Amino acid sequence: VRAAGVHLLIDSGPDFRQQAFRAGIETIDALLVTHHHFDHVVGMDDLRPYLFSNRTPIPVHAEPASAHALRDMFSYIFRDGTYPGVPRLEMHDVRGPFDVISRESPEQSVRIIPIPAVHGSLDILGYRIGRFAYLTDVSQIPNASYSLLEGLDVLVLDALRDRPHPMHMTIEKAVETAEKIGARQTYFTHMSHEILHQDFEERLGEGMAPAYDGLTFEAQL
């Protein structure tokens, strides 16, 4: 996400390195973690090259329980006295809205609003940046979070499959949730292989579409 001169990465999955090359990502000012499940954080070590030319540590923002888990999972990064060459990352517990400052131009910053959500029995976070919000791996959105999602240009929302799953929204529930939020455009993500892209697309109304690798869009700050 590029916003107000700040470059943000939401989660770092197993193919982050390949996707970063593909997208031409040259700098990262912060990593926003939705939750600590392996498929969303295993690429964290691949932030290393972004610290070669600028040794300013990259902040990692996560819900407190996920931050604690990540400190254990990546202890070689976050413990005191790490050896030279490990990614210089700083963990920050997310307890409310916060600002991310550009590592290259400290006078530039952007406000981040965390969106509490639920992934099965796990408390997780979505993130709102201006009129864009990202909510993946969601089974429930608490009522209190809906007020944080008003007036969106673009929403990216979890939609796994048609069959129920204890930790993800079904397509039907995701569509209902998107209609309730009322973003101008909703893109569904984290789809399984049980539905083809074109078939999914044909089922959706105006202002809704399945996401895909390489998708780009704009939203107001």
For each of these PLM feature ranges, what is it?
Residues Q140-L221:
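Cap/insert and terminal regions of metallo-dependent hydrolase folds
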Residues V1-L135, E201-L221:
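Binuclear metal-dependent hydrolase catalytic cores
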